[in-house]
Amino acid sequence: MIAKHGNNSSTSLSGSADLLQHAQPKAPVISATTNKTLPHIYDKSNYALLYARDWHPGMKHAAPIRKEVPVRTIFNLLGPLANPLQDTGMVECCVLGVARKDIGENFAEALRLGNARKALVVCGDENLDEVSCAGPTHCWYIREEGTSVDITKLIVAPEDFGLPRHPLSEVHGGKGPAENAKILMQILRGELPDDHPVLHFVLINVAALLVVSGICEADTSSMGAGDDGNVDKERGPGGLRWKEGLRRARWCISSGEALRQWEGFVEATNEHAQ
């Protein structure tokens, strides 16, 4: 199950909530995801967006001011740590992006103190709050080892996933949420070429979550139709199977499973909005 904590844009062209609200032919009703409806939504899909303005209603008072300030503020730091499910014990693992390398360790420590047991804080070498497709990504890996929870610093690059590097100029988002939503649907429908830079960018970030979850440590694989079961056991930075994460991420799209889960999310949220 995925619980994406997202919001409308304050300092960029398009936030995750903006993108989903512009999806075609039918958009999910993100405000319909509440603590009461979440169990039903997860019955229909393994994905949910937790709309920050609904789950943290007090924050709406800061939204107009944030839009007027042309730089990042403390809210850009608080948002990633404020997933409303984080303290419920429901979150098994997480990947959190930060836009400055000098605060990566602080975020990792905050997650550790918040009882995270499997997590990855990432910052691209360009101070990108994603796993970078252009070069190295600085990572702080939180994992439980016996009775302790340790933080390990490591660096991953696209080649650790078995992919080439792409300049960030090749994966720049659209001019607005509508264009970004169109790209999202092209990815989910498998309409982008296998070597498309944007697809590679998405795949390595999905793969990172799969790696941290621990599922890539399995020596067998039976995801469903189209899975040949050939687990990639090669290990990379941190002794982890980054290429196996990529293999599983590709299957999610090629099998149509990612699209089916998206459609389930759209259907469930629209049902609750009626």
What are these language model-derived features?
Residues 1-10:
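Active-site cofactor/substrate anionic-group-binding motifs, chiefly glycine-
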Residues 9-26:
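Active-site-proximal loop->helix
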Residues 21-274:
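Glycine-rich anion-binding loops and their surrounding alpha/beta cores
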